Amino acid sequence: MKILLSAYACEPNKGSEPGVGWSWAIEYAKQHQVWVITRDNNEPSIKKYLEEKTEYNNENLHFIYVGLPKKLTFWKKGRRGMRLFYMLWQRKAAKVAQELNKKEHFDFVQHVTFVSYTQSSYMYKVGVPLIWGPVSGGENIPNGIKIKMNKKEAIIEAIRKASQTLALYTLSIRKTMKTAKMIFVATEETRQRIPKKYQDKTYVMPAIGIEQMPEIIQKRQTEKPKIIMAGRLIYWKAFDIGIKAFLEIAERYPEIELHILGEGNQKKKLQKLAGKYLGDRVFFEKAVQHDEIYQFYGKFDLFINTTLRDSGCMTMMEAMSVGLPCIAIATGGPGVLLKEFAECRVEPTSYDDCVTAVASLIEDYILHTDKWIEIAEHQHRYAAETFVVKQKIDYIQKTMR
């Protein structure tokens, strides 16, 4: 088949949105002719990577680099400006796609990035079957969980909720939903925001994925359990819940350690929260290269995720893939990743309840490590069956028939 991908963000060796675009492009190209429309600023890193990694540089993979006039790049500064810049880029990308389709006659077009249902895509104009997503953006901090936010953070959350409603009245988004042959959403929260009349063609599928499964790192009983949390240290990631859970049981179990990997504006606040344990039993790790993350996770015994509105959670997907037992608050992407593991999920009822529940699961790991090693093996097998991008593509092709 000939496939066209719209991937505004698409770069090798990157996480988040660029990694999503790249992994879908690479995997499709193993089976089909693929054209990828992406931003022109991605060109240097893509070309450099393909020159170094010749196994990815095959005749099936074609990149079309689309840019906007330099005078418009100032719009990329700030949230509102970025949305406008992205919309203008999408309009131009659609025109490029229409012209390209006249020559190549694509079997279908898929919008891959940005992974947000609240931002416009114009690929419905190409005139071939459209797959929209996986997209996200329907997630919010659960009403029952009250976290401290400054004025700026509160405004961000208010704007987010407003944009979720506004999206359903945006003409380009409505046309995309109507025209799409299939709609893939990354979370159950986003699925619930898709109008009922389109639910029969809407499927839940994590947007993120891994190219190939790493080898499982065999876990065993240890006298000094090490817990790891990873991600951006920002307010809605709620690392404070994990730290407070650790503090609840730290005195009873003096052998455990908590390690935190990530940077962000909450770092100093979190370090202060660790109190007397900072540098002794609570450690903030230095940055780890993307290609070294699996080896890094192998040093730990339990992964905790406390994010309150994440659409994907690549860090947890990587941890499960390498055989590290994971627990998480059951919201957004983490809730999807652990949907088959009720014993590892913390329901988002209230802030204090989440702290207590996470502490209880840590304690359960300490007291019943063998059980959790078995859970980790089950999670690893589940990851092998559902997290690999090839399986997502196979599912799409099967569903389209």
Per-range role (PLM):
Residues L367-M400:
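A charged, aromatic-enriched C-terminal amphipathic alpha-helix characteristic of glycosyltransferases
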Residues A287, Q295-F300:
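Short alpha-helical donor nucleotide-sugar binding micro-motif in glycosyltransferases
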Residues P325-A328:
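Short hydrophobic beta-strand element within catalytic cores of glycosyltransferases
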Residues K269-V288:
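Nucleotide-activated donor-binding/catalytic signature segment of Leloir-type glycosyltransferases, i.e.
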Residues L308:
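Aromatic "clamp/platform" in nucleotide-sugar-dependent glycosyltransferases that forms part
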Residues H62, W132, S163-I216:
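Donor nucleotide-sugar binding/catalytic pocket of nucleotide-sugar-dependent glycosyltransferases
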Residues G19, P225, R232-E248, N265-K268:
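A conserved mid-protein helix/loop that constitutes part of the nucleotide-sugar donor-binding site
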